[in-house]
């Protein structure tokens, strides 16, 4: 099986490591190549254009892991491609024309947007509890942030971060309907090399059917903080609470707590779970490798994934939500992080925990 990685930067190398681990641990013969602006010391076959790579390498899977602003141009270059496309989130930026992408990808055999938190054991357990007990969502809130100040990687802004939380709320409660934004406040700044007025933070209200959602997401959170809180009612109108905590204290270390309160107000724990995976070779990659493994098995063995991929329709639906969020955000004058003559960027060889 041949896998082409378009963009072998930080994200692309994460995919490379994941696929190489899958090959070594499963025995599946995977052949990797990449497209980039310049050749790197990787030992992998290199192509300087997407068109040439598609013709010469003929990949079964194409991974799109270029920076946010290059997603749309690269996806359009896949017009006529008949293999499987695995795309880093978000699908495109708020400035791109979504309608032009449908035609470009109409012949692909499959598509998956990389929404890795769906592949957390904690997330999957909560989804099963909600479904099994027929809980009805009443409220949801999230805080989803990390520090991307002076990061060397270009970005379209906080829409690339908030997509995880917005997707999770809907994915956990699929029967509740489609998420609708009600209001958005935000802040723009020069935190990124991508410009002086990039949206770095949003605070939003939304509706998911009869449930109400509040959320905060930021690329200038000075610590990584990823939590989702949900309140439900069960068949007996009893209030149930659940909290998901992701990537704390380390990447892929996730926790779930589900509880209610008795008549006296005392907390009654219903379920508690935590995961701290430490499989060698998968540092920061445990959830991503699950997605990659399912893509490989779907293509190579025609094996249905354990859960449906976040397909192109889902990616477009989420992107329209992000576009509305970006355009509707009420913002004050931009904040300034750069006060000296030059910007000091985070080094490309920084540790994975800092970059994540």
Question: Where do the model's predicted regions map?
Answer:
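N-terminal Rossmann-like dinucleotide-binding module
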Residues: 1-42, 56-57
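A contiguous active-site-proximal alpha/beta segment in oxidoreductase catalytic domains
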Residues: 69, 92-152
């Amino acid at each position: 099986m041949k896998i082409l990685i378009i963009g072998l930067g930080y994200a692309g190398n994460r995919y490379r490591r994941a696929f190489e681990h899958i090959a070594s641990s499963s025995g599946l013969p995977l052949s990797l190549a990449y497209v980039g602006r310049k050749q790197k010391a990787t030992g992998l076959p290199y192509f300087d254009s997407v068109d040439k790579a598609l013709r010469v390498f003929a990949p079964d899977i194409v991974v799109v892991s270029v920076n946010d602003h290059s997603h749309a141009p690269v996806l359009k270059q896949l017009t006529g491609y008949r293999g499987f496309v695995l795309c880093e989130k978000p699908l495109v930026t708020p400035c791109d024309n979504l309608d032009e992408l449908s035609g470009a990808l109409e012949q692909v055999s499959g598509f998956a947007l990389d929404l890795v938190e769906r592949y957390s054991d904690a997330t999957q357990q909560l989804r099963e509890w909600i479904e099994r007990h027929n809980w009805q969502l009443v409220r949801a809130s999230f805080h989803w942030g990390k520090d991307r100040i002076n990061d060397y990687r270009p970005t379209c802004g906080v829409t690339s971060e908030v997509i995880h939380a917005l997707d999770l709320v809907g994915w956990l409660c699929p029967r509740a309907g489609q998420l609708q934004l009600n209001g958005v406040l935000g802040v723009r700044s020069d935190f990124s090399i991508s410009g002086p007025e990039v949206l770095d933070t949003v605070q939003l209200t939304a509706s998911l059917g009869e449930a109400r959602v509040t959320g905060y997401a930021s690329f200038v959170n000075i610590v990584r903080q990823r939590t989702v809180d949900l309140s439900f009612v069960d068949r007996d109108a009893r209030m149930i609470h659940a909290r998901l905590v992701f990537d704390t204290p380390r990447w892929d270390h996730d926790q779930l707590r589900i509880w209610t309160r008795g008549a006296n107000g005392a907390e009654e724990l219903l379920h508690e779970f935590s995961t701290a995976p430490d499989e060698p070779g998968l540092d920061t990659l445990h959830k991503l490798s699950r997605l990659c493994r399912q893509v490989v098995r779907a293509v190579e063995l025609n094996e249905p994934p354990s859960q449906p991929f976040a397909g192109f329709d889902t990616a477009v639906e989420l992107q329209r939500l992000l576009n509305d969020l970006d355009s509707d955000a009420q913002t004050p004058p931009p904040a300034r992080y750069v006060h000296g003559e030059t910007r000091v960027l985070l080094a490309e060889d920084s540790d994975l925990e800092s970059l994540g």
